[in-house]
Design a protein with these regions (language model features):
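Short intrinsically disordered terminal tails
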Residues: 1-2, 85-90
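Short C-terminal boundary/hinge segments that cap the last helix of small helical domains
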Residues: 64-83
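Key DNA-contacting residues within the recognition helix of helix-turn-helix
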Residues: 18, 43-44, 71
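Short Asp/Glu-rich motifs
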Residues: 40, 51, 79-80
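Short, basic-rich loop-to-helix N-cap that marks the start of a DNA-contacting helix
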Residues: 44, 48-61
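Short polybasic/polar patches that bind polyanions
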Residues: 15, 22, 33, 47, ...
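A short, Lys/Arg-rich alpha-helix, primarily the initiator
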Residues: 1-26
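Short alpha-helical DNA-recognition segment
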Residues: 23-43
C-alpha cells in the first residue's frame, strides 16, 4: 500500500465483482445469465458487502476469477482493520 493511500476498512464483494466485470468487458446481463439469476437480482447482490458462498462460487466460475482469494489477500493486507477479529456481539 502506498503511504498516501487510505486503508480500506471493508472488502466490498459487490464492488470487486463489478470491477472484474468491467475489466473483462462483460455486462451485468451476461453474468446474470451465466449464474442463472435476473439482472435485477445481480444488481442487488453487487450493492451488498456480503454474498452467499454458493452464489460467489457461481460468479467465480463464470468470470474465471477467484474472489475468495481476493478477500483472503485483503484480510492479510495492512488495510485489514486490526480490531476486525473482535467478536463482541456473537
Amino acid at each position: 500500500m502506498d503511504n498516501n493511500e487510505t486503508p480500506i476498512e471493508t472488502f466490498h464483494i459487490g464492488k470487486a465483482i463489478k470491477a472484474e466485470l468491467a475489466r473483462q468487458g462483460r455486462s451485468i446481463t451476461w453474468l446474470a445469465h451465466q449464474i442463472g439469476c435476473t439482472r435485477e437480482n445481480l444488481y442487488k447482490i453487487m450493492r451488498r458487502e456480503w454474498i452467499y458462498t454458493d452464489v460467489l462460487f457461481k460468479i467465480c466460475d463464470a468470470l474465471d476469477h477467484d474472489f475468495f482469494k481476493a478477500c483472503s489477500d485483503w484480510r492479510k493486507s495492512p488495510s485489514y482493520p486490526k480490531n476486525a477479529n473482535q467478536t463482541d456481539n456473537l
